[in-house]
Swiss-Prot record:
The complex is composed of two ATP-binding proteins (ThiQ), two transmembrane proteins (ThiP) and a solute-binding protein (ThiB). InterPro entries: SBP (IPR006059), ThiB (IPR005967), ThiB-like (IPR005948). One of its GO terms (biological process) is thiamine transport. This is Thiamine-binding periplasmic protein. The keyword Signal applies. Belongs to the bacterial solute-binding protein 1 family. Residues 1-23 form the signal peptide. Thiamine binds at D64, G65, A166, T167, W202, Y220, T221, T222, S223. The keyword RNA-binding does not apply.
Length: 334
């Protein structure tokens, strides 16, 4: 009995002297909801980076890219975000002016996007072209130009996204402004007759489209690749318009809070390499912006290629965004 007590005491003494398991370092990433969905890149990105960093990644999702910036502005210096992933070039001037973002400090040699966008704060991770995607079984003769979309049959509906919360919605706003200029308000009034509804983010809009609520949706030239690869169908198609298609380059950046976390810079560097970039074509269904270890899926060869790329300089977007949103509101509320 005495021996048992001694052994028991010795066992507890050893346990007491053993170091406690250390909690893993954490990285908090604000992004949009489709990125972290079960079919998006988020789960695999988390898995790949956690293996590399021996850390814990926590995603916090918002409706879309514009909503991300709005949220960060509300939280200010108290934000929990180390990284914001899901902004685009249309928001960089405004995001920089907020003072909540810090230089990336990483080598961006492998990053290549149309127009050779480079920035010391905002790092591209993918890009694509906004397009009208349509259901060829319900709409055998889709609008072949932006003009035809604006002036076509009101019975043929399209689902759009809100430019105040969603980067695709903002992209559509800038697409219309690029083509119609001072006549954009009048063009919006005409197009409004074809709009079934305006959603807060891309996911809601595309969900309505695939459920058959409307034969058209604002999405990307790359969206049909998902249906070709996953669903083995070419039913859904995208259109390259003669007026041009508006370019989106998606970006990530570390916050000033995140700059104090060594994992933030490490993640941005990881984001430009194959562990992240290989996932983009078949989970985010966009073109990769960094180094990959394999070619694009064959389905991408069948996608329409815009002959003309439209992109308004970020400083001009920042200067006029509120004015153009108000123009859209006035035109579509009549």
């Amino acid at each position: 009995m005495r021996l048992l007590s001694l052994l028991t005491f010795s066992l507890f003494a050893v346990i007491g002297l053993a170091p406690a398991a250390q909690a893993k370092d954490k990285l908090t990433i604000y992004t949009y909801d489709s990125f972290v969905s079960e079919w998006g890149p988020g789960p695999k990105v988390k898995e790949n980076f956690e293996k590399e960093c021996d850390c814990e990644v926590n995603f916090v999702a918002s409706a879309d890219g514009v909503a991300l910036l709005n949220r960060l502005k509300l939280e200010g210096s108290k934000t929990a975000a180390d990284i914001v992933l899901g902004l685009d070039t249309n928001l960089t001037t405004e995001a920089r002016a907020s003072g909540f973002f810090a230089p990336s400090g990483i080598d961006q040699t492998n990053v290549k996007v149309p127009g050779n966008f480079k920035d010391d704060i905002f790092v591209p991770y993918d890009y694509g072209y906004f397009a009208v995607v349509y259901d060829s079984e319900k709409l055998p003769n889709p609008p072949k130009s932006l003009k035809e979309l604006v002036e076509g049959d009101p019975a043929q509906k399209i689902v759009l996204q809100d430019p105040r919360t969603a980067t695709p919605g903002l992209g559509m706003l800038l697409w219309m402004k690029s083509v119609y200029g001072d006549e954009a308000g009048a063009a919006w009034q005409k197009l409004q007759k074809r709009v079934l509804t305006v959603t807060p983010g891309w996911s809601e809009a595309y969900g309505l489209f695939t459920k058959g609520e409307a034969p058209m949706v604002l999405s990307y030239t790359t969206s049909p690749a998902y249906h070709m690869v996953v669903e083995k169908t070419d039913r859904y198609k995208a259109l390259a318009y003669p007026e041009g298609n508006y370019l989106q380059i998606e970006l990530a950046a570390q916050t000033t809070t995140g700059a104090k976390n060594p994992l933030a810079k490490k993640f941005l560097a990881f984001m430009t390499g194959p562990g992240f970039q290989d996932l983009i074509p078949e989970t985010n269904w966009m073109f990769p912006a960094g180094k990959t270890s394999k070619p694009l899926p064959a389905a991408f060869d069948a996608l329409p290629k815009p002959e003309k790329t439209l992109l308004i300089p970020p400083y001009e977007v920042a200067k006029n965004r509120r004015l153009w949103v108000n123009e859209w509101l006035a035109a579509t509320s009549r």
